[in-house]
From Swiss-Prot:
ATP binds at G37, P38, S39, G40, C41, G42, K43, S44. One of its GO terms (cellular component) is ATP-binding cassette (ABC) transporter complex, substrate-binding subunit-containing. The gene is ugpC3. This is sn-glycerol-3-phosphate import ATP-binding protein UgpC 3. Its EC number is 7.6.2.10. It comes from Agrobacterium fabrum (strain C58 / ATCC 33970) (Agrobacterium tumefaciens (strain C58)).
Amino acid sequence: MAKIALKDVRKVYGGNVEAIKSVSMEIADGEMIVLVGPSGCGKSTLLRMIAGLEGISGGQIMIGDRVVNDLEPSDRDIAMVFQNYALYPHMTVRQNLAYGLKNRNTPKEEIERRITEAAKALEIEQFLERKPRQLSGGQRQRVAMGRAIVRKPAAFLFDEPLSNLDAKLRVQMRVEIRRLQRSLATTSVYVTHDQMEAMTLADRLVVLNAGRIEQMGTPIELYEKPATTFVATFIGSPSMNLLAHGAASSNVSAGWSVNAAAALPPTVATLGIRPEDITLAEAEPADAAFAGTVQVDAVELVGAESYVHGSFPDGTTIVFRVPGRSQLRIGEMLKIAAQAKDFHLFDAAGKRI
């Protein structure tokens, strides 16, 4: 186990394409960090740089008390888990688990002990004599994780390991990964584009945007206090509603308004409201900080609740949550409201106020 530290790490391609822009972070010993962001944000590149699969153009990477900039991946004391499993098809599960240890001349008794421990933790004991083709996708991913676990590395690096699994199995596997990581207390860096996966797994999240860290913090910190409009719309599903706060916000014809009593700062350019913080109203309540009349465009039933997609007369769209199985009709007009305590305020640059 070891901490990981990045200081002003950069990656430049072709002399002028900067993929990673002076990224600095410290990952504590035993911490689970999740790198999340849209395609092309640099999360996989950053993981590969930590692993040594991608060279760095500047800065410093430390694993434990060693600077690893110039070390080969095999010398960094890390273990990686990929989305494509990377198992040897002609070997049994037991042989796959043992392969890396044999190459390191680990004693036979120690190999067997580690395989037994990992197989028990991953519940794959009954599959040890099978070959990968005889396993399901979830079982193969457990074996891939087992191969990383038996190495007892200083850190685990996960590169979108659940991407090939169906939705139900992804939920099951991410819970298992979190349970295992906590029990092993091994420093871990996990890459995903799935913000729900990120929220479930992370001790802290790192949201990346165009090669930069947009915000780093616990899942609840990023959800409740997004630093920018980018984070506000990326973390949370459905996304936070962002409304342009200007002349239209006091224009009755827009179909929505902000009560003057809310006393928003003059620097507010964008008003953010989470879907769950918007309520239906019989009439526009006098004490509501935000109120409006919206047309129902679509209703998304997700089980115990529904999400209503609507639009105001000025064309502004909004999403809000209603409990239960909604009987709302497409085209129906509804009155909605929200309180000032639930507002997220951003300036013209998209920064939180």
